[in-house]
Amino acid sequence: MQVLVGLLALALLGAGPAAPAEPPVVRVKLTTQAGVIVLAIDVKRAPATARNFLAYVDDGRLDGTRFYRASRRKGAPQLGFVQGGIDTDARRRLEPVALEPTSKTGLRHVDGAVSMARYEGVNTGTANFSLMVGASPNMDARPGSPGYAVFGRVVGGMDVVKRILAMPTNPGGDGAMKGQLMTRPVTILSAQRLDGTPHPTGRAKVWLLFRR
């Protein structure tokens, strides 16, 4: 019996301290060519989407990506959203995250909201995200539409977001992006978490080996 107790004690000592829990809100600093934007990522209310985004941040997968879309509202061009992230760069992509609808999280597409972009399929979000300028309730979940996942808010640099929204766009493009692709995309020089402990995935950083 004493031997078993001793072995158990050694096992507990060898296990070391438990990993610290993620803070309920994690701030992320985006340093861009247009200035600094600070996001507050809501780990508590949108845990899957938040952890997915933070994985990209902790891996450095957002460093060198761009804000490439400025979607201005017709009749009120000072409102809309900007979109950025990995775009179609498959070298940076991790597995898609399941949609956490606003009807589940209680988060809404209010002014400054951070929203996960996706393809037509519901569970197709990766690391393209939108920053709201003004409220966009049409992007919330509603009967007949799953909407998009809100997972944070802008807490610093909203003036930078508005400046990006006002930048020139090309008249071309297809579908919803027609006329919204920026003439000169704004590079995200770095994305850095300001709270909690980074949890890199350990995956190969292929985009660093074969730069475009």
Residue ranges and their predicted role:
Residues 15-212:
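Cyclophilin-like peptidyl-prolyl cis-trans isomerases
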Residues 3-14:
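Bacterial N-terminal signal peptides
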